[in-house]
Amino acid sequence: MKLNELMQAIPVFTGEASETIEISHIAQDSRKVKPGTLFICIDGELVDGHQFASRAVELGAVAIIAEKQLDVSIPVIYVRDSKRAMAMLADYFYGSPTQALKLVGITGTNGKTTVSHLVEQIVRENGEQTGLIGTMYRKIGDQILETKNTTPDSLTLQETFRDMLLSGVSTAVMEVSSHALVQGRVYGSDYDVAVFMNLSQDHLDYHHTMEEYANAKSLLFAQLGNSYHTSNPKIAVLNADDEESVRMQKATAAHVITFGIKQQADFKANNIRITSHGSTFDLRTPIGNFTLKIKMIGNFSVYNVLAAIATSFALHIPMEKAIKTVESIPGVKGRFELVHAGQEFPVIVDYAHTPDGLLNVLETIAEFAEKRVFVVVGCGGDRDKGKRPQMAKIAVDYATNPIFTSDNPRSENPRAIIEDMIQGVPYSDSYVVHENRRDAIRFAVNEAEAGDVILIAGKGHEDYQVIGDEVIDFDDRVEARIAIEKKLGLA
């Protein structure tokens, strides 16, 4: 593609977009530059891409997008916002793939991963080829690809959408993080349905205030645009029980569908019954009433199912198909996942890493726990420190046997993180501390008896632990199974 054609994606810029320069590749990482590359300088949180412009030229870049003045031997085009420009250029370069896809974006503090998997499976069961982008992986049809972020950078994102189209995908479902929205990674993506789950404290190390965090989430709904007079109107699916849904609704001109348990909603659950094996509830919808029996446990699971069914309705999938699918799904890896190895007590691994997420899971466990509740919990390093005492307080208030441990300490001292947690529970001596996460899991398993419940919280599906600059193999589910087998004399 000629540079002058590609630059049609950007309405205002400074510099000459030559009609003779051929662009075969776009990169923001100088290590990925090859002959024919348009190199985009991003001034990021850790690294300023402008510092690598000369290196990009050496590697074969033929033009550069920048915000700051550069002294290089190839054409430089200057823009106000390189991140936004990169997203728009990526969309244009890869043929605006989301205009040919049905695209669903799901945002919120908790529930994104589960809802995205539920919606993807519902659409797949309806006979469509699907794509999925989220915390655990990217999926194109049956192909699984690794992912580093919940929402990839805009270049990777648009390339993935292009690959989905080439593979016959018709509907893509993706998690949309607040970081991605603020950083402009999803600019240029044409969403058909946007879903808001909830908002509670998380990522304040980045957003600083809950107001900024909420505003970040609302960007997804502002991006839906105004489609009242089109044959395929955009739809916002909102949690009626979360007060921030008002903000999301104000941010969009799209149609709104609501779901909830407490407030009036288009998709409302009544008569919820929770057991250790699943949940049942009556569902009221715009097209009739239904009774559901799902294999997932807890009110938070009911919210996730409501969101998935409301989204399926927005995608014109038959209600019976959506209900049958969600009733057949046992859950998502690392989300209230049971570890069975012959023990007499349930061991649950869950990704709960926010105060609200931990509270939801512990409240659910309280519905069926017969005796003691053990919770193994830590907090991530180099992340929102404000939630550490809150996590500890919830663990102490809602579990009989809290065990404070390491999560992903990253560059911080694990003991210092635990000390931050303990600041939230000066009134309690019910907790114990095992800094080593493996030791904490083994302690819980060895102490537990029939009728008790163990929750291992915070890491869920993750199969690694980040300690300093080292990433080590570590999976809560594997560690729990090993501990159980040792206790039972099976290992």
Curated annotation (Swiss-Prot):
The keyword Cytoplasm applies. Gene3D superfamilies: Mur ligase, C-terminal domain (3.90.190.20), Mur-like, catalytic domain (3.40.1190.10), MurE/MurF, N-terminal domain (3.40.1390.10). One of its GO terms (cellular component) is cytoplasm. Its EC number is 6.3.2.13. UDP-N-acetyl-alpha-D-muramoyl-L-alanyl-D-glutamate binds at S30, N149, T150, T151, S177, Q183, R185. Its main location: cytoplasm. One of its GO terms (molecular function) is tetrahydrofolylpolyglutamate synthase activity. The keyword Cell wall biogenesis/degradation applies. Disulfide bonds: none annotated. This is UDP-N-acetylmuramoyl-L-alanyl-D-glutamate--2,6-diaminopimelate ligase. ATP binds at G108, T109, N110, G111, K112, T113, T114. InterPro entries: Folylpolyglutamate_synth_CS, Mur-like_cat_sf, Mur_ligase_C, Mur_ligase_C_dom_sf, Mur_ligase_cen, Mur_ligase_N, MurE/MurF_N, UDP-N-AcMur-Glu-dNH2Pim_ligase. It catalyses: UDP-N-acetyl-alpha-D-muramoyl-L-alanyl-D-glutamate + meso-2,6-diaminopimelate + ATP = UDP-N-acetyl-alpha-D-muramoyl-L-alanyl-gamma-D-glutamyl-meso-2,6-diaminopimelate + ADP + phosphate + H(+). Its cofactor is Mg(2+). The lineage of its organism: Bacteria, Bacillati, Bacillota, Bacilli, Bacillales. The gene is murE. It holds the Pfam family Mur_ligase_M. Keywords: ATP-binding, Cell cycle, Cell division, Cell shape, Cell wall biogenesis/degradation, Cytoplasm, Ligase, Magnesium, Nucleotide-binding, Peptidoglycan synthesis. Carboxylation is probably crucial for Mg(2+) binding and, consequently, for the gamma-phosphate positioning of ATP.
